[in-house]
Amino acid sequence: APASGFFGMR
């Protein structure tokens, strides 16, 4: 779930 990581960074 790479998308989760992107959202977490933001």
Swiss-Prot record:
Post-translational modifications: Tachykinin-related peptide 3(3-10) occurs in two forms, Rhopr-TRP-3(3-10) has unmodified Met-9 and Ox-Rhopr-TRP-3(3-10) has oxidation at Met-9.
A GO CC annotation given for this chain: extracellular region
Modified residues (Methionine sulfoxide): 9
Keywords: Amidation, Neuropeptide, Oxidation, Secreted
Localization per record: Secreted
Function, as annotated: Myoactive peptide. Increases the amplitude and frequency of spontaneous contractions and tonus of hindgut muscle.
Full protein name: Tachykinin-related peptide 3
Taxonomic classification: Eukaryota, Metazoa, Ecdysozoa, Arthropoda, Hexapoda
